[in-house]
Every structure is written in C-alpha cells, then in structure tokens.
Amino acid sequence: GHGFYYASGSITDGWKWYDNPETINKLTPLFEKYGVDMVFSGHDHQLELLQKSGVSYVICGTFGGALDSEREYVSPQSVWYSSKDYAFVDVTINGAEANLIFRDPDGKVLNSFVIPKN
C-alpha cells in the first residue's frame, strides 16, 4: 500500500508521521491472521525496516520528493532507518526467505537483510 503502518518519524504541521493507529488497528490484525510475511509502503520519504508479530514492514519512499528530516520518534518496531539517501529496495525471494537490499540510485548497497518466511 501507499500509506504506512508502523513507522518512525516526526510531527509536521500538526500531523504525526509515524505509527499510524488507523492502519495498524484496521489492517495489521489481518496481516497476522492470514500469515502475511512482508508489507511494503511508501508515503514517508525515508527507508525503514520494522518488524512486529512475524510481519516485516518495509518503507521505501525515497525515490521522489524531498527526503524527510531526521526522525524525532523511533517506533518500537524499528530495525533499521535512514532518511539520508535517495534509494530503492531490491527484493529477491529464494524459497523460504527474502533478501532485501536497500540501494542508492547508483546501485550501491546501503544495507541488506534476510527475512525468513513465517
């Protein structure tokens, strides 16, 4: 989806750009119930990997507009975060695991993770 679920972030113009209770309360129980392994979103202009109850949440919103400022709030679900680079996420699924590689526009690796299937 476009909008985020769990996320680190800041308050901008009165809006909380982090851990969205509306999407968390409505959709994350379904992700957990039906065994969803990974959820991708953007909207926030940052890179982040978050994990909660066996579901990995990947935010990759850094290939367009201005990058977000450094986060003021750190989500308890956050595993890794960056708002310093324009980037994309390269995903390879190999049977029981997914390899996530966050890359800058030139392909340089910023970070990588192996996510096992639930």
Please annotate each region the language model reported:
Residues 1-110, 118:
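Long, structured stretches of catalytic cores involved in phosphate-ester chemistry, encompassing
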